[in-house]
């Protein structure tokens, strides 16, 4: 049977570092822009809301809790319709998310970014 992998050392991302190292709206990072989703569009029905006040963010592996016990992942913005992002922002499609930690300790953001990359975001 398979052997258990040793967890690899997580290197925090540097400020303004991207994985992949390309802009958010390039094909290599996120695919083609599919168009803004409005509340009245059919695609809006495909978005999955989270109304549970006890859940800040889905973290099945508890990576944030394992890294920083007692700290939760905090989503500050997901799908958006307010027009405060650039025209083809992935926030308008529900494909971008802005995250922080519940303690708002910005010294954790590099490692948080790495955890997001490792989780497939």
From Swiss-Prot:
PANTHER family (alphabetical)? HEDGEHOG, SONIC HEDGEHOG PROTEIN
Functionally, this protein is described as follows: Intercellular signal essential for a variety of patterning events during development. Signal produced by the notochord that induces somite patterning, dorso-ventral patterning of the brain and early patterning of the developing eyes. Displays floor plate-inducing activity. Binds to the patched (PTC) receptor, which functions in association with smoothened (SMO), to activate the transcription of target genes. In the absence of SHH, PTC represses the constitutive signaling activity of SMO.
Species of provenance? Tanichthys albonubes
In its UniProt entry, what is this protein called? Sonic hedgehog protein
Q: Quote the record's binding site residues for Ca(2+) 1.
A: 60-61, 76-77
As for PTM, the annotation reads: The C-terminal domain displays an autoproteolysis activity and a cholesterol transferase activity. Both activities result in the cleavage of the full-length protein and covalent attachment of a cholesterol moiety to the C-terminal of the newly generated N-terminal fragment (N-product). The N-product is the active species in both local and long-range signaling, whereas the C-product has no signaling activity.
Into which family does the record put it? Belongs to the hedgehog family.
UniProt entry tagged with the keyword Lyase: no
Tell me, how does this one assemble?
A: N-product is active as a multimer.
* Keywords assigned: Autocatalytic cleavage, Calcium, Cell membrane, Developmental protein, Hydrolase, Lipoprotein, Membrane, Metal-binding, Palmitate, Protease, Secreted, Zinc
Superkingdom in the source lineage: Eukaryota
Written domain comment of the UniProt record = The sonic hedgehog protein N-product binds calcium and zinc ions; this stabilizes the protein fold and is essential for protein-protein interactions mediated by this domain.
Write out the residues that bind Zn(2+).
91, 98
One GO BP annotation here? tissue development
GO cellular component terms, A-Z: extracellular space; plasma membrane
Offer an example of a GO molecular function term for this protein: calcium ion binding
Localization (cell) = Secreted; Cell membrane
Annotated residues for binding of Ca(2+) 2: 61, 77, 80, 82
């Amino acid at each position: 049977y398979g052997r258990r992998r040793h967890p690899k050392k997580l290197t925090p991302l540097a400020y303004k570092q991207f994985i992949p190292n390309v802009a958010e709206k390039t094909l290599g990072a996120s695919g083609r822009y599919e168009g803004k989703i409005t509340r009245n569009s059919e695609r809006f029905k495909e978005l999955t809301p989270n109304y549970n006040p006890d859940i800040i963010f889905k973290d099945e592996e508890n990576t944030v809790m394992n890294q920083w016990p007692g700290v939760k992942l905090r989503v500050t913005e997901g799908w958006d319709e307010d027009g405060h992002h650039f025209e083809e922002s992935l926030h308008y499609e529900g494909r971008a998310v802005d995250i922080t930690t519940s303690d708002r300790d910005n010294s954790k953001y590099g490692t948080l970014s790495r955890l997001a990359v490792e989780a497939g975001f």
